[in-house]
Amino acid sequence: MERSYVSIDLKSFFASVECVERGLNPLTTNLVVADSSRTEKTICLAVTPSLKSYGISGRARLFEVVQRVGEINAARRRKVPGGTFTGKSYNDPELKKNSALELDYIVAKPQMSHYIEMSTRIYDIYMKYVAPEDVHVYSIDEVFIDLTAYLKTYGLTARELTQRIILDVLRSTGITATAGIGTNLYLSKIAMDIVAKHIEPDADGVRIAELTEQSYREQLWEHRPLTDFWRVGRGYAKKLEAHGMYTMGDVALRAEYDEDSLYKLFGVNAGLLIDHAWGYEPCTIADIKAYRHGSSSLGSGQVLQCPYTFDKARIIVREMTEQLVLELVEKRLVTDQIILDVGYDIESLSRREIAAQYKGEVVRDHYGRQVPKPAHGSCPLGRQTDSLKLIMDAGFGRIWEIDGAKAVPGKYIDLSISGVDVGIPE
């Protein structure tokens, strides 16, 4: 029986949540999600579609946004009589209607816990239509759903059911989505990532594209660049192009007459690449559900520009904790322990008053210089969880009680969560 899968991606999710919270339209409001209290080198976690239309990348650094908006406004100003703007706006239709307005945008500080809550709320909407065993959460803003068993139940086509689900999400949350429908997981993902991006959205901003193995070959065998395809990174693309393969059609052709050369290039991974070149995907959602995660920990580390005091370091660790919990939720994992390591360098004791007060152990670094001994500690959570609140409340405070964490300004911070496993929070 031919299966019907859909891949749903929430449009500029973090940015859309921030717009909805402000009562603004996510499709027409110029907004970036970034922590402007840090340096302008900070990466924007999301950019709204209207701001992207001005040539701003979805993962730009904040200074790049500032620079690009400056260029746009310089060009707009030249067209204004007298060279003076009459006002400014972050509403894109208003900007397009009135060239005398300066392009403005909102910088929204990331709220990871809020995004997780909204993602959970949207997942609950999916559960109104399908069962959990037919859903794979790929990330906080993207899911795969096997619609096969539900089409007869609802008396709808895969496109009609997808449209119904997406419109329910839109009406309930104000957030729109892009979707791809395919006869396997790979085709649904490619339909969403490549085909849907090149079609006009409907009145609600929704794009839905469909692919079969045959239409995939007809439409995308000549598509470039190769990096647009799922699981083809720059390294793969560079290696393929170095051997005369510039499209998926080229890969499929090479597999027909010289399959061994692909295995020599990519080893066992060549099998998946060949399958994808032909539009095949043997993996199902049931297979994904049966898979056991191999890693038992997740981690995050930062080298700070200068040694941070305890209070400043707490802010950094809080952000790192939010990012790790977000990764837990994205991967449908749980944890039962958090671990903190704080490292130091010679700058940590550079101020005389701090050096005079420090009573802890001193060790030598790789260069033989004296530095404070690194601080290390862990905090069991008592149960497996992916709750940001529980991890913050139960672990965040206690972990700072480790010896040395508060003693002197730290330069290196490593945070990890261990006991990670696939499972349902207790």
Segments the model singles out, each with a brief description of its role:
Residues M1-D275, P282-I285, E426:
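Gly/Gly-Pro- and Ser/Thr-rich, intrinsically disordered tail segments characteristic of DNA damage-repair
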